[in-house]
């Protein structure tokens, strides 16, 4: 992180200007994100670019965040990994699990596709929740712009922030962060259990949404979304 861990005074104005040039439909949401990061700059994810890090909280950094915020909302297809598979895995399948030699190439390819599918489920979950929560005033922190937080909400009357972190499974690595600087708690929720065949929708935080969020609706969203971009 840059030594200057703060955002410039006109950060919200810059946020609107930058997003107006990229996608005006997201300007209000992005402004709210920058409002949050201006108050809690230590919660901002560390930019990959050294040049952007040098200009933390300034116009160049805000434009970088705006581009990521927008691009992460564009349709995203499952992409099989490009890594070369380890042939010893096939050997283990053949010897230890009695998988016939003629089936190994098919299994290898299906494993690649399965990995691609598994890797995108978390993104699909966030997109589904964004569709449900953003009309209620929550903002999807697309572009991994905020550490340990996926959705934020601002109560203007109380000047209070709501923070939500979502995970696809209960054994997915979670950030150890449970609060931000002013002791605002980060609500945490996961969708599925790793040790039993069950989902966790019934425990979605009531204070976040009163909408009927459930597994059937999520699966319908996933199927519709993937068919549109196929």
UniProtKB/Swiss-Prot annotation:
The protein's Enzyme Commission number: 3.1.21.4
Catalytic reaction list: Endonucleolytic cleavage of DNA to give specific double-stranded fragments with terminal 5'-phosphates
One GO biological process term: DNA restriction-modification system
GO-annotated molecular function: DNA binding; type II site-specific deoxyribonuclease activity
Disulfide bond residue pairs: none
Main enzyme class: hydrolase
InterPro entries, per database record: Restrct_endonuc_II_SinI
Pfam families assigned: RE_SinI
Keywords, alphabetical: Endonuclease, Hydrolase, Nuclease, Restriction system
Name of protein: Type II restriction enzyme SinI
Species the sequence originates in: Salmonella infantis
């Amino acid at each position: 992180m840059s030594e200057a861990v703060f955002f410039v005074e006109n950060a919200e104005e810059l946020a609107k200007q930058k997003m107006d040039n990229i996608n005006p439909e997201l300007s209000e949401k992005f402004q709210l994100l920058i409002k949050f990061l201006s108050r809690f700059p230590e919660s901002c994810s560390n930019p990959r670019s050294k040049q952007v890090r040098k200009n933390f909280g300034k116009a160049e950094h805000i434009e970088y965040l705006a581009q990521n915020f927008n691009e992460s909302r564009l349709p995203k297809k499952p992409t099989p990994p490009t890594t070369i598979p380890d042939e010893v895995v096939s050997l283990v399948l053949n010897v230890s699990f009695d998988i016939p030699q003629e089936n190994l190439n098919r299994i290898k390819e299906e494993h690649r596709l399965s990995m691609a599918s598994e890797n995108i489920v978390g993104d699909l979950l966030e997109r589904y929740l964004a569709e449900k929560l953003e009309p209620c005033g929550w903002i999807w922190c697309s572009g991994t712009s905020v550490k340990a937080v996926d959705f934020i909400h601002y109560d203007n009357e109380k000047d209070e922030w709501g923070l939500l972190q979502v995970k696809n499974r209960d054994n997915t690595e979670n950030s150890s962060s449970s609060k931000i600087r002013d002791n605002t708690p980060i609500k945490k929720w996961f969708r599925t259990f790793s040790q039993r065949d069950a989902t966790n929708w019934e425990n979605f935080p009531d204070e976040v949404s009163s909408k009927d969020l459930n597994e059937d609706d999520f699966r319908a969203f996933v199927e519709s979304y993937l068919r549109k971009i196929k």
